[in-house]
Amino acid sequence: MKTWSFTQYEHLEYLQELTNANAKLKTIIGNDYMVAPDVVVYRMPIDDEELNRPFTVVDDETATMTEIRSINNSRPLLLASVSAKWTMRSDRAQNSRTEALNLIRNRKGQAPHIVVVTGEPLPSRIASLALGTGDIDCMYHFALYELVKAVEEYGAENGRDDIVEQLDTLIAGKRLKDISDLPLDLAI
């Protein structure tokens, strides 16, 4: 599914058509506005009958511009973009950050949740992406509890309290969570 398939980014389809038709425009604008998330979570707009169950919420005079109403919008709404990175080399971390910034910068309307799922075993590499200015909502580790145990054991055996502290900081700061938290966080 192309990013422009979603209501927040539908204008990018028109921009793509313009740049494809005009070489000068393409050299000026480029195409860095296009994002290809690994996984997307979206919902379709809802018809008024469903929205008005069990009592009236919308009518011809209220909520006339909201994209959640199917009468106003036929495209899906992007709720979350998930970047999947098995490991976190610095270039991979930068790709996730670039994807996130493009989604934030190029949207019209509500920003989707922007998260990264990883299996990276090194806290310093996780921190390279998890710490930052909020372009990534949160990182999720596919085996966080096992990682914490392994880092604590390694840190104790090798006098590396720094890596234990770094991992604790990421977790306490709500920058890193276990993958089991992801579905519930996206439900909010």
Regions from the language model: what does each represent?
Residues N106-I188:
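C-terminal tail/extension regions appended to the core domain(s) of diverse proteins
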Residues L77-S81, K108-A111:
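Short, surface-exposed connector motifs at secondary-structure boundaries
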Residues E49-P54, T87-E99, Q110, S124-A127:
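Active-site-adjacent loop/helix micro-motif of nuclease/hydrolase catalytic cores
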